[in-house]
A protein has these predicted regions:
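N-terminal hydrophobic targeting/anchoring segments and the immediately downstream early-domain regions
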Residues: 2-232, 288-343, 347-395
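Active-site core of metal-dependent hydrolases
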Residues: 216-219, 224-295, 309-317
Length: 395
């Protein structure tokens, strides 16, 4: 090899190495944010500004949202973000008294509402790209434990502005603080799909110790505890699932029906001795999507004393408007009673919405326009969910 060719080869290798370094740096520093920005969108068709009357009423409410996937993304909850739907500054602007933060541990490739297998996962690459601890790269349990740690650390760093909710007493303290005029926001840790148990019953206790106080049994695929509405078999509870269900009720962990198959949901509703929730979704009567609840399922939730959280994205309500959201809420009321209606946004859950958490007064405006009383609006916007939390959470 000639001296000229060796020098050319050396330069080529150095140049290729530089390209790899730059590409790798972009993957780890820019990539995760670009992915989130492309998945958690705000539709440009923003609703009209709420009236002064609606804003004044909204400020008096105890607003509760039962589902946001914010912990999945590489953002500081305490800082205002230029992407996504939820952070503490926007929660405060939206008058949110309590936000349920869910841990998403696995998402299948080609995810859809009809049928997904469990043999692929999009979250693994995301955990690596975000430079999460290596223990999370191959363990669904460790991913959820890491999400719980993120939430706990945010509360510690917030100077009291973000308060972890784990007991009935915590709920009471939050309500008292809000009514005393303190700008404090509650945060309850949930998980979306008990695939993070990794088939081990004892992991319920590990997640409980980390702060889990609500859990959906499935996400987009069948797992070791239950069939998913979007799985292949769509079966009911497994033997492990029944043990887990009973243990959750005994331990004061709220059972979430979201994403469960109709068979699994029916079994859980019949097995329940405490209120159950469907944390986020819609109703088939106003938006005929398979993940949404039938009237009989709404009645089943109501019979347990639970609540149905209505979301704001297209698959939940079919239109990105406050009207569509309140149409679904009013159907829940018609079938299950006023005490069954609640909110469950699915913010930051790879969905497009027309308003983020800072603009929740648009729902209050729509409810007001429909002639609902302040007492009814207070129940829908959060009072019903707080009642369920006080009924189920441990002392």
């Amino acid at each position: 090899m000639t001296h000229h060719r060796r020098r050319w080869l050396r330069r080529s290798v150095i140049g290729l190495g530089a390209v790899v370094v730059v590409a790798g740096g972009a993957f780890f520093t820019v990539g995760p944010g670009m992915v989130e920005k492309s998945m958690n969108k705000l539709d440009p068709g923003r609703p009209s500004e709420p009236s002064r009357e609606a804003r004044a009423l909204h400020a008096r409410l105890l607003v509760v949202d039962m589902h946001a996937d914010t912990l999945m993304w590489d953002r500081d909850l305490l800082d205002r973000a230029v992407r996504g739907h939820v952070d503490l500054p926007r929660l405060r602007e939206g008058g949110v008294a309590l936000q349920v933060f869910s841990s998403v541990s696995k998402s299948p490739k080609g995810q859809n509402y009809d049928a997904n297998t469990a043999d692929s996962d999009n979250i693994t690459l995301l955990t690596i790209a975000q430079l999460q601890p290596p223990r999370t790269w191959g363990s669904l349990l460790e991913r959820s434990l890491y999400h719980a740690e993120k939430l706990e650390q945010a509360a510690k760093d917030s100077g009291g502005a973000l308060m972890l909710i784990r007991t009935k007493a915590d709920v009471d303290r939050l309500i008292a603080a809000r009514r005393a005029g303190q700008d404090v926001t509650g945060a309850l840790f949930s998980v979306e799909g008990l695939q993070n148990l990794e088939g081990q019953f004892d992991n319920v206790a590990r997640l409980e110790a980390a702060g889990m106080r609500m859990a959906g049994f499935t996400h987009f695929f069948d797992n070791e505890v239950a069939g998913s509405m979007h799985g292949v078999d769509k079966g009911g509870l497994t033997d492990l699932g029944r043990r887990v269900f009973d243990a959750m009720e005994q331990r004061g962990i709220i059972v979430d029906l979201a994403h469960a198959s109709h068979t699994a949901m029916d079994e859980m509703l019949r097995r329940a001795t405490k209120p159950l929730v469907a944390s986020h979704g819609g109703v088939q009567a106003t938006c005929d999507v398979n993940r949404n609840l039938t009237d009989e399922e709404i009645r089943g939730v109501a019979r347990t004393g639970g609540v149905v959280g209505v979301g704001y994205w297209d698959a939940a309500v079919c239109e990105l408007t406050p009207k569509a959201v309140v149409d679904a809420i009013e159907h829940v009321i018609k079938v299950g009673g006023i005490e069954t209606a609640a909110l469950g946004s699915d913010y930051d859950g790879a969905v497009t919405v027309a308003w983020d958490t800072s603009d929740l007064a648009v729902i209050t405006q729509e409810l007001l326009d429909r002639g609902h009383s302040e007492e009814e609006i207070a129940a829908i916007m959060g009072g019903n969910t707080l009642r369920v939390m006080r009924a189920v959470l441990p002392d």
